[in-house]
From Swiss-Prot:
Belongs to the UPF0060 family. Keywords: Cell inner membrane, Cell membrane, Membrane, Transmembrane, Transmembrane helix. It is found in: Cell inner membrane. The lineage of its organism: Bacteria, Pseudomonadati, Pseudomonadota, Gammaproteobacteria, Alteromonadales. It is a multi-pass membrane protein. Its main location: membrane. The chain crosses the membrane at residues 6-26, 33-53, 61-81, 87-107. This is UPF0060 membrane protein Ping_0587.
């Protein structure tokens, strides 16, 4: 159950970060309304708050979170930007998830 909870928190955190960064991108690069910065700020504030809910030390959390972030970013690529990930993208995600699992669930007495 702990693994599922950690994965869930990491996933929600990644979505908050991606939304918070994607909305300014839409404003700066694609000419959308500057008002997108308002929900972007809320999303990034939620991202920071969500990081405080993670069960491990900050450095370990950030390192492990990166694996989930990569996964969610590629899902975003596919679902929001309509660009299908390549096989090497998917292999990279698998490697990142394995790395995240080693960091989060590996023994601490070494």
């Amino acid at each position: 159950m702990e693994a599922l909870k950690i994965f869930g928190i990491f996933t929600v955190t990644a979505v908050a970060e991606i939304v918070g960064c994607y909305l300014p991108y839409l404003w700066l690069r694609q000419g959308h309304s500057i008002w997108l910065l308002v929900p972007a700020a809320f999303s990034l504030a939620a991202f920071v708050w969500l990081l405080t809910l993670h069960p491990e030390a900050a450095g370990r959390t950030y390192a492990a979170y990166g694996g989930i972030y990569v996964s969610v970013a590629l899902m975003w690529l596919w679902l929001v930007e309509s660009t299908r990930p390549t096989m090497t993208d998917l292999l990279g995600v698998l490697i990142c998830i394995i790395g995240m699992a080693v960091i989060m669930f590996g023994p601490r007495n070494v």
